[in-house]
């Protein structure tokens, strides 16, 4: 049986701002820890995989008054980063740190390059003073340090086993019966932890709507029709994502290494559960199922892909959670997931930025609508298009498309983004 507590500890974590620049700040701060505090930093060199490079290019760093990108994350990691906080390493950032970071970048001390042949999550940082140099490498996961060295001498080396995430899902088969059995045995501590995520993600969405941030408008709570509930889910998801991408200094609960995935995995299920009068434990079980289904999908498609994870992983997962919570069958869970996939397949990832909010909002809405369709015995039945005869076939078809097109698609996106980032 899947160990729910272990999965939640591994795959569901608070994150401040976008995950990728947070990981860069963490890596730089960890490298700087091995340099003498009394020596002036002369240079920071950051090399990243294509996914890290892309996702951090335009996103706002929380607490920086609108400063964007991987370079500012790297500079701040050196100036005020706390490696013990990992993805929240920049929690203590203030105006004086920001100005110092901008001067560091303007002086040419921060170099950033993209390793276009490097897949997945990879960050290689070297920081130098006049007399010393330190290096930190992250590989495989946003907080998985594989190596730390000072002056060429390795001071820490993570084993492959330490760096690899625990394996919870193996093979193509969708283990929905095992997932349901797992969440049915949920304990009180896991319920509390899941509701920490609900509170966190509702809080940032509510903040955005109360402050009137861009597209974030207040949502009326007095209409529980299906149409209005779908709109409410869409707005809450979009507001949480927009605030996060715009640098609001509030954390979100991530899922599968992504804050936007966490928003879609959690909020549609939580909002639906509240509207339908479900108990705290019933909602927690459904969100736990949503997290686990996301984990299964990501195990097949990959942690970072050229397609949008909020749409093509979290959306189907949330639909599964809603169907389960409203007493649907395992067949209806698979049907709801297939309907989401048929709606979201063409949604690519062109980097993290405020516009992601529209994708995240749409993903939450289509998750709810697909769940309602499945419960009403309606779905996109396969085979048609990429939707196969089974949910496993559908996911395998999407994996094949993603794998075959990944390198060319990612490089094309980077070429386009770099035109505007010179």
Swiss-Prot record:
Superkingdom of the source species: Bacteria
Query: InterPro entries, per this entry?
Result: Ser_deHydtase-like_asu (IPR005130), UPF0597 (IPR021144)
Record-level Gene Ontology MF annotations:
L-cysteine desulfhydrase activity
Q: Return the Pfam families for the record.
A: SDH_alpha
Q: State the Gene Ontology BP annotations.
A: L-cysteine catabolic process to pyruvate
Q: Which HAMAP family match?
A: UPF0597 (MF_01845)
Family, according to the entry, reads as follows: Belongs to the UPF0597 family.
The protein here is known as: UPF0597 protein Kole_0595
Q: Which organism is it from?
A: Kosmotoga olearia (strain ATCC BAA-1733 / DSM 21960 / TBF 19.5.1)
